[in-house]
Swiss-Prot record:
Enzyme class: oxidoreductase
Name of the featured protein: Deoxyhypusine hydroxylase
EC number assigned by the record: 1.14.99.29
Pathway assigned in UniProt: Protein modification; eIF5A hypusination
Gene label: lia1
Length: 318
């Protein structure tokens, strides 16, 4: 999309598709509208944030969690209050409230701290408490309270705001560093924020030993931590992670937020091993898992089609 202000008619059409009041649009098409609104939100368009927020009346846990993620990636302080409203809304699904809290951490504004501290102390649900813990730590880090002049090498992932920054550069050789990080990622005595930083440093290293070290994270007792491991594998598009991701998706005893993230990661990798399992679980009894597989398959179909643009860009009259 160009740098010129987008006509209101385009915003209105994207909002219409995303909110889907008439139930006429399939989930995959609504994702494409969200993709367009994401691009506009990142350019500072407040109308895109407003359009996304209106769709939180929907009942799709998957879509709402993705909308919260997009708001967190927008960089807009304007998105803080809508996200606070979502965290405060106890009728929203856990995965949606978690993503809204994480989004507040991604935005990094100190005005979010009171609500995050409240639910870190009071929420009965561990994923919410842990997310708030991470978001608080990230806001403190971003605002210079805990940076200590760290040297962090730029990476290919810098366009995405992570729940925690990667660990700073290490003096050790890579093999020794990965061995150290592999022991730390599973060390329950270390703070959660520290272990998340370990996770993202391993992602940035990105070799096969780092992938195997990250795989150990699937043994963690925290569903939140396990789901982030799957998310990271989706970012890395690492074929070496496929067996572990398939195992997670196939495990019907695993919590939905972890299985859903494994499905999305498999969709990103999209090799021959991924397709059959995604097709199988697109009919899963757990809605968020089934929908994740459906969206993943749609993305794969788009990649195969050779289309230049995944986003839905409305054509409106001048």
């Amino acid at each position: 999309m160009s740098s010129e202000p987008v006509p209101q008619a385009v915003i209105d059409e994207l909002e219409r598709v995303l909110v889907n009041l008439d139930k006429s649009n399939p989930l995959s098409f609504r994702y494409r509208a969200l993709f367009s609104l994401n691009a506009l939100a990142k350019k500072g368009d407040k109308r895109a944030v407003d359009a996304i927020y209106k769709a939180f009346i929907d009942d799709s846990e998957l879509l709402k969690h993705e909308m919260a993620y997009v708001m967190g990636q927008s960089g807009q302080q304007y998105a803080v209050q809508p996200l606070i409203n979502i965290v405060n809304d106890l009728d929203q699904q856990v995965m949606v409230r978690h993503e809204a809290a994480e989004a507040l951490g991604a935005l990094g504004f100190t005005e979010s701290l009171p609500v995050l501290e409240k639910y870190y102390k009071e929420d009965p649900l561990a994923p919410i408490r842990e997310t708030c813990e991470l978001a608080i730590a990230r806001i403190q880090w971003k605002n210079g309270l805990d940076k200590n002049n760290e040297k962090i090498t730029p990476s290919m992932y810098d366009s995405v705001v992570d729940p925690a920054p990667p660990m700073p550069d290490h003096e050790q050789d890579v093999k020794s560093e990965v061995a150290k990080l592999r022991s730390e990622i599973v060390d329950q005595n270390l703070p959660l924020f520290y272990r998340y930083r370990v996770m993202f440093r391993l992602r940035n290293i990105g070799n096969e030993e780092a992938v195997l070290a990250l795989t150990d994270g699937f043994k963690d007792p925290s569903p939140l931590f396990r789901h982030e491991i799957a998310f990271v594998f989706g970012q890395m598009i690492a074929p070496a992670s496929v067996p572990a991701l398939i195992k997670v998706l196939e495990n019907t005893e695993e919590v939905p937020m972890v299985r859903h993230e494994a499905a999305e990661a498999l969709g990103g990798i999209a090799n021959d091993e991924c397709l059959p399992v995604l097709k199988k679980f697109s009919k899963d009894d757990v809605r968020v898992v089934a929908e994740s597989c459906i969206v993943a398959l749609d993305m794969i179909e788009y990649e195969k089609s050779g289309d230049m643009e995944y986003a839905y860009i409305p054509k409106v009259s001048a």
